[in-house]
Amino acid sequence: MKGREYEDLAARYLKSKGYQILGRNLRSPYGEIDILAEFEGRKVIVEVKGSETFFPAEKVTPHKLSKIIRTAYEVLGEEPFSIEVVVVYRGKVYHYKDLGLEL
């Protein structure tokens, strides 16, 4: 699988859980938002990581989260949002909702 395929799988998974996909690959000078969604009336920034050889959750570093947050503020302004991570590892989806980041 390649990056786009991981994001496609993540988007299908999120839709199956009731998320509305609002945008994908949204860029700012600070970085990129893989998926912008809405769930139960709130905006959700979803970072997608995938790998077939190692569990990729370690790629979501504090530096990466900082870039995601700056990009989210650039895209959403002052609108509240949360950040979630979807990891695709060997074809299985892992969804991390509660990162303690309700901004």
Curated annotation (Swiss-Prot):
Q: Sorted alphabetically, which Pfam families does this protein's record hold?
A: UPF0102
Q: So where does this one cross the membrane?
A: none
Q: Which domain of life is it from?
A: Bacteria
Provide the coiled-coil residue spans.
none
Single GO MF annotation: nucleic acid binding
Question: What InterPro entries has UniProt attached to this entry?
Answer: Restrct_endonuc-II-like (IPR011335), tRNA_endonuc-like_dom_sf (IPR011856), UPF0102_YraN-like (IPR003509)
Give the similarity note.
Belongs to the UPF0102 family.
* Protein name, UniProt field: UPF0102 protein aq_041
